[in-house]
Amino acid sequence: MVVNKTTAVLYLIALSLSGFIHTFLRAEERGIYDDVFTADALRHYRINERGGRTGSLTCSGALLSSPCTLVSNEVPLSLRPENHSAAAGAPLMLRLAGCGDGGALQPGKRGVAMTVSGSLVTGPGSGSALLPDRKLSGCDHLVIHDGDTFLLCRPDRRQEEMLAAWRKRATQEGEYSDARSNPAMLRLSIKYE
């Protein structure tokens, strides 16, 4: 089989071009790597407009779509119902939103539901140590299956009287302007399991 010289040169040029194009396209693929999520990686720090780092993403346990938030910053202190004992105070109902996945009600499985417990803390300074006398009795444990629910806290009678006295004093003195100087402020500490 005799091949023309010009045809052989054209075949060699086409073969070298296809090899070059194939190598060029594969080189582009080699530069792409899988973006694996690592919670403590430095690339997950947020950078502000001045080039400073403002925070980091920290993950532990099961990653949920959103943490719980209070629907309102105000919690009404109701009068003690007659059917409660003298030792127990009136329950405080805290409406929460955005808990868990916020989807339809699903059976409690790991990764779907979330167990929440919390406590109300009195006194100024969110970073201060939680002394036993400054911590109200714990809120009920509940399993959250939906995106909207409530947390029920039951202060005892002594703590309820203390809250009522603080509310009365703050109302008379008009000290609602500065949250740090107002000892009547309650802070909610929510723990996720």
Curated annotation (Swiss-Prot):
Record's GO cellular component terms: periplasmic space
Q: Which domain of life is it from?
A: Bacteria
Classify the main location: periplasm
Which Pfam family, just one, is annotated for this protein? PapJ
Q: Does the keyword Signal apply?
A: yes
Protein localization: Periplasm
This molecule's function is given as: This protein maintains pilus integrity and thus is an important participant in pilus assembly. It may function as molecular chaperone directly or indirectly in the correct assembly of PapA subunits.
Q: Which protein are we looking at?
A: Protein PapJ
